[in-house]
Every structure is written in structure tokens, then in C-alpha cells.
């Protein structure tokens, strides 16, 4: 029988670059998790996505063992990559940070569909387009009915 769940920890870590420094070390250390074991497991599982910010959900059990789930990168990170920008607009209503196409939004939604609260790729793309607008990124070619 598996040990009961003690805690669920949510972090955002760059793929392949987990180390015991903050924020990982303190977050795991206070629950008694072997930090180096987590870092090695995370880095080996995410070496193909080196440097990309990845949300991870760590489940800590009462016997101090753990499991973790690596999710897809945040839509904001993927939008910045597609728009080829470093940061979003400070004031999205006045400043234009960049431009993406509707097809870019569809690609991002397809990649994130399992993590989005949407049933179809088109609805997910609408959510991604909303994130883009809140970042000051213009979405070109969006269908009128969407």
C-alpha cells in the first residue's frame, strides 16, 4: 500500500537546470524530501527541454518519498518565443510588445491542450489569444466568429 499524501508542491523550474538552491531546496527541504534525488530525476526527465520554464507538481508522501508531474510550459513563455520577445508590454493597452498569428495560437493550444480548461483546440487557442492580448501581443488573422 502506498504511503498517504502529505503535501503537493507546485514550482516552476527551467528544464534540465534544477539545483538545490532556492526556490527548490527550501521548498523540498521543509518536507524532508531528498533534494539531490529530485534534482537528478527532474534534470534527466527534462533534458530535452533545456532552459524552458516548466511547471512541476511534486507530490510528497508521508514516508518522504515523492512523485512529480512535469506540465507543458506556460502560455506566456510559449507566446514570447513565438513573438520573439524577451518581456511582455508593461502597459498592454498602450504598448505593443509583438505580434503572433492565429496559427501560432492554435499551435500553442495544441501543445497545451491537456493542461488547458478547454475541450477543443480552437477554444484553447481563444484562451491563448486572450493571454497574448493581456501581454500586449497582437494576434493577427483571428477568424471573426472566434
Curated annotation (Swiss-Prot):
Modified how: One or more lysine residues are methylated.
SMART domains xref list: RL11 (SM00649)
Molecular function GO labels: large ribosomal subunit rRNA binding; structural constituent of ribosome
Keyword RNA-binding assigned: yes
Pfam families referenced in this protein's UniProt entry, alphabetically: Ribosomal_L11, Ribosomal_L11_N
CDD domains: Ribosomal_L11
Keyword field contains DNA-binding: no
Gene3D superfamilies reported in the protein's UniProt record: Ribosomal protein L11, C-terminal domain, Ribosomal protein L11/L12, N-terminal domain
GO BP annotation list: translation
InterPro entries to which the protein is assigned, alphabetical: Ribosomal_uL11 (IPR000911), Ribosomal_uL11_bac-typ (IPR006519), Ribosomal_uL11_C (IPR020783), Ribosomal_uL11_C_sf (IPR036769), Ribosomal_uL11_N (IPR020784), Ribosomal_uL11_N_sf (IPR036796)
GO CC annotations, alphabetized: cytosolic large ribosomal subunit
Record key words, sorted: Methylation, Ribonucleoprotein, Ribosomal protein, RNA-binding, rRNA-binding
Family from the record: Belongs to the universal ribosomal protein uL11 family.
Subunit structure: Part of the ribosomal stalk of the 50S ribosomal subunit. Interacts with L10 and the large rRNA to form the base of the stalk. L10 forms an elongated spine to which L12 dimers bind in a sequential fashion forming a multimeric L10(L12)X complex.
Function recorded in the entry: Forms part of the ribosomal stalk which helps the ribosome interact with GTP-bound translation factors.
Protein name, per record: Large ribosomal subunit protein uL11
Organism for this UniProt entry: Salinibacter ruber (strain DSM 13855 / M31)
Amino acid at each position: 500500500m502506498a504511503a498517504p499524501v502529505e503535501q503537493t508542491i507546485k514550482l516552476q523550474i527551467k528544464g534540465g537546470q534544477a539545483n538545490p538552491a532556492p526556490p527548490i531546496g527550501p521548498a523540498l527541504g521543509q518536507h524532508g524530501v531528498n533534494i539531490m534525488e529530485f534534482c537528478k530525476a527532474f534534470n534527466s526527465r527534462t533534458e530535452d527541454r533545456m532552459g524552458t520554464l516548466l511547471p512541476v507538481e511534486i507530490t510528497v508522501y508521508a514516508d518522504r518519498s515523492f512523485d512529480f508531474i512535469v506540465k507543458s510550459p506556460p502560455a506566456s513563455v510559449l507566446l514570447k518565443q513565438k513573438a520573439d520577445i524577451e518581456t511582455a508590454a508593461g502597459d498592454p493597452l498602450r504598448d505593443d510588445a509583438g505580434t503572433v498569428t492565429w496559427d501560432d495560437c492554435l499551435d500553442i493550444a495544441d501543445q497545451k491542450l491537456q493542461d488547458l480548461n478547454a475541450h477543443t483546440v480552437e477554444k484553447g487557442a481563444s484562451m491563448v489569444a486572450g493571454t497574448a492580448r493581456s501581454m500586449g501581443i497582437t494576434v493577427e488573422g483571428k477568424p471573426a466568429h472566434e
